[in-house]
Amino acid sequence: MSEAREVFLRARGRSFTSFNKDAESQWKGPFYFIQGADPQFGLMKSWEIGDCDYGGDEWEQEIRLTEEAVKAINKLSPKPKFFVLCGDLVHSMPGIEWKEEQEKDLKNVLQKTHQEIPLVFVSGNHDIGNAPTPETIQAYCDSWGDDYFSFWVGGVFFLVLNSQLFFDASKCPELKDNHDRWLAAQLAIAEERKCKHAIVFQHIPLFLQKADEDNDYFNIEKSLRQEILQMFLKAGIKAVFSGHYHRNAGAKYNDLDMVVTSAIGCQLGKDAHGLRVVVVTEDKIVHKYYSLNELNTNGLDQELVDLLKTK
C-alpha cells in the first residue's frame, strides 16, 4: 500500500519528487504532457437529479470515463512527461459522507496509469471546499500531496496553485498569506531565470472569454484577476491551464494563453468527455483537446507528433 500511496503524494515540501530540479532545469528538446480536469466522481448523478449538494451517491459513470482516460494515456507513444488533473477530483465536498469512498475509487483507477507517467494533482473547490479551512486543506494534502508547489521539466518551470485561496480565503487568511508570499517568490524565479517557458496550473480560470469580463462563479474576481494577470505577464508566464467550467473556453491576453479545459466527467456544455494534449517546443506551446474516444482510437495527431521531432 505504501508504494501505491506514494504515487499520490509526490508533491511535498513545495516541490514534486518525480523530477529533479538540477537535472530538469535545462532545455532538452520538445516534450508533451496531458491535462485533464474535473473527473468529479458523483457529479453526473447529482446533475441528473438536480441535487448538486447531496445527490452524488453513485459514480459508476465517472469510474468508466476515468478508466477510458487512463487507457488512452497509457497507449500513447512516446509517453507524456506527466498527467496533470486540474481539480475537482471528486464531487463530495469536505464533510459529505461519500467523499472518502469516491477518493478511494478514483485512486484505484488512477494507479493504473503507467508508472513512467507521474500524476500531478491540483486542488479544486470540491476538494477543499468553496471557503477552505486549515482542516480541509490539510485533509487534501494528506490524501493528494501539497496544495501548491513548483517543479521543472526539461527547462520549463511549472507552478501549481491553490486557486480557492483567490476565491474565498476568509476562513484561512494565514494560509492565503503563505501562498501569496510563495507565489511572489516563484514568479521572481521565473522572471530572473528567463526559463524557456513558465506554465501555471490552477482549478479556477482567471477568465473564460476575455480578461475584463464580469465576475462569475467560474472565474476569479475582476480586480484580483487583473493584479494576477499583471504579475504573471511580468514574470513571463506563457500559459495558465485550468478546469472548473466543465466546458472548453479561454482566450489570449497579451502573451498569456488562458486555457480552460472541459471535464473528464460531467459535461455542462456540448463538449465530449476528454483530455488536453499539450506540446512544448522551444518557441511555443501548442495544445489540442481530444475526446476520450478520439484519443483512445487514434492517438496523437501527426501534426503534434511532428512538433515533438523538431530540434
Swiss-Prot record:
Positions bound to a divalent metal cation 2: 88, 125, 244
Record-linked InterPro entries: Calcineurin-like_PHP_ApaH (IPR004843), Metallo-depent_PP-like (IPR029052), MPP_CSTP1 (IPR041867), STPP_CPPED1 (IPR051918)
Domain of life: Eukaryota
Cofactor binding, note field: Binds 2 divalent metal cations.
CDD domains noted in UniProt: MPP_CSTP1
Region described as Catalytic: 47-250
One GO MF term attached to the UniProt entry: protein serine/threonine phosphatase activity
Gene Ontology cellular-component annotations: cytoplasm
Catalyzed reactions per annotation: O-phospho-L-seryl-[protein] + H2O = L-seryl-[protein] + phosphate; O-phospho-L-threonyl-[protein] + H2O = L-threonyl-[protein] + phosphate
EC code: 3.1.3.16
UniProt subcellular location: Cytoplasm
Pfam families per UniProt: Metallophos
Family, per entry: Belongs to the metallophosphoesterase superfamily. CPPED1 family.
The protein's role, per its UniProt record: Protein phosphatase involved in the dephosphorylation of AKT kinase family.
Protein name: Serine/threonine-protein phosphatase CPPED1
Organism of derivation: Xenopus tropicalis (Western clawed frog)
Gene: cpped1
